[in-house]
Regions:
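Short loop/turn segments immediately following the C-termini of beta-strands
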Residues: 22, 71-72, 119, 163, ...
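C-terminal structured "cap/appendage" subdomains that terminate the fold
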Residues: 247-257
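Extracytoplasmic beta-rich repeat domains
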Residues: 1-11, 39-61, 73-74, 90-111, ...
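Hydrophobic alpha-helical hairpins/lids featuring a short glycine-rich hinge
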Residues: 2-40
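Repetitive beta-architecture junctions, highlighting loop-to-beta-strand starts
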Residues: 24, 75, 112, 120, ...
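Short loop/turn segments that connect beta-strands within beta-propeller blades
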Residues: 30-34, 41, 81-84, 126-130, ...
Length: 257
């Protein structure tokens, strides 16, 4: 990676600020004084691996825990004490690098899950002990060939609603809807859509429909609307460039790149 400094949004918890560098170095900073309270070379310590553009994950605070995706052969995700930086648990390895997306934390029928994306899998972690409850091979679901290097560039945070999780990735990759059952301990593929492949700009869900821009090339993409329940493309509006989307006050705002 050629981006050693922080590439993520900082996470604020009270008067503490938590950040990760592009190399996976974590730090807790006093928000009042600006001094570093603790730091951890997380990727180096836990033999993490990541893509050519470095670490871009925004950190999640959950009670006393801070979650970070290392990737690599030793573990996939770790939980550390937010006050000290000491390890609480680490998951098994999925033998793939970290992606560029940020995880989500969800409560489903009394179960608490951390869900994130790797270049090969979407996976769910039991936050009480770090066990990986399920993993969905999105490459296989979309009929893509894995190059064995985990080189897929995936940036979009998964979207959670009711009992379903939407994964999407650009570069002609596509989208996978994942259905959770058994208190979130089991997962299966509900539908796939190879035309809705969101690059960087994220997605929003409004009244049962997903909105975002697909990827044609790095400079072009179309605005799309997809049915949340079926994956059907409702419309695709030709445009000059892909971009970001947000919903507020009954309006969908599209911001092209």
């Amino acid at each position: 990676a050629s981006h050693p400094e922080s590439r993520c949004s900082p996470t604020v918890d009270g008067d503490k600020i938590y950040v990760s560098s592009g190399f996976g170095d974590l730090a807790c900073i006093d928000g009042n004084a600006g001094n570093i309270l603790w730091s951890l070379k997380a990727s180096e310590t836990y033999k993490g691996t990541y893509g050519s553009w470095g670490i871009a994950e925004s950190l999640i605070i959950d009670g006393e825990k801070l979650y970070f995706t290392t990737g690599g052969l030793e573990t996939m995700t770790i939980a550390i004490n937010k006050k000290t930086g000491e390890l609480i648990w680490k998951t098994e390895s999925l033998n793939v690098p970290a992606s560029y997306s940020s995880p989500i934390l969800l409560n489903y029928e009394g179960y608490r899950l951390l869900v994130n994306v790797s270049p090969v899998y979407v996976y769910g972690v039991d936050v009480t002990n770090g066990s990986i409850l399920w993993k969905i091979n999105h490459m296989e679901a979309l009929g893509k060939e894995d190059d064995g290097k985990g080189s897929q560039i995936l940036c979009v945070t998964p979207l959670w609603h009711n009992n379903k999780i939407l994964f999407t990735g650009g570069y002609n990759h596509g989208s996978v809807m994942i259905d959770l059952t058994d208190n979130g301990k089991k997962a299966s593929v509900a539908w796939t859509n190879t035309d809705f492949d969101v690059h960087h700009g994220g997605v929003v869900l409004v009244d049962g429909y997903i909105y975002g821009s697909n990827w044609i090339n790095n400079g072009n993409g179309n605005w799309c609307c997809v049915d949340w329940n079926t994956g059907k493309m409702m419309w695709e509006e030709q445009w000059k460039c892909k971009g970001s989307v947000i919903f507020a006050d009954g309006m969908i705002y599209l911001y092209e790149e």
